A protein has these predicted regions:
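C-terminal motif of bacterial Sec signal peptides marking the signal peptidase cleavage site
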Residues: 5-7
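Short proline/glycine- and basic residue-enriched helix-capping loop/turn segments at helix->loop/beta transitions
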Residues: 9-42, 67-98
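A short acidic/small-residue loop/turn micro-motif
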Residues: 28, 58-63
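Short, acidic, Ser/Thr-enriched surface-loop or helix-capping motifs
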Residues: 45-46
């Protein structure tokens, strides 16, 4: 079994409340090979409360976890009518010991 530890860095003080949150799946290849990773993203929150324009700032190992991060963030929902730009988030992937 693998676990996902998530840290968050927010540089906006008046963030809309997050209503729906989904965690990224741990990729099977990474879990089977006990690969750790980190993904830092910057994204916007649209007026409709959805996540838009995800930009990868850092991804280690390169692109291994990106797809799962995008899939999870596509499910996120925030309060409507409170758009924000340049919100930062860090995902830390750490496999469980065998």
């Amino acid at each position: 079994m693998s676990s996902l530890v998530m840290g968050c860095t927010q540089h906006k003080t008046d963030m809309p409340r997050q209503l729906v949150k989904a965690l990224p799946q741990y990729p099977a290849y990474a879990a089977a090979n006990y690969i750790k990773g980190r993904v830092d993203v910057k994204f916007d929150i649209g007026a409709d409360g959805t996540v838009t324009r995800i930009e990868f700032i850092r991804s280690e190992p390169h692109h291994l976890f990106d797809e799962q991060v995008v899939k999870a963030m596509a499910k996120w929902r925030f309060e409507k009518d409170r758009p924000r730009k340049g919100v930062k988030k860090t995902f830390i992937f750490s496999p469980s010991a065998p």
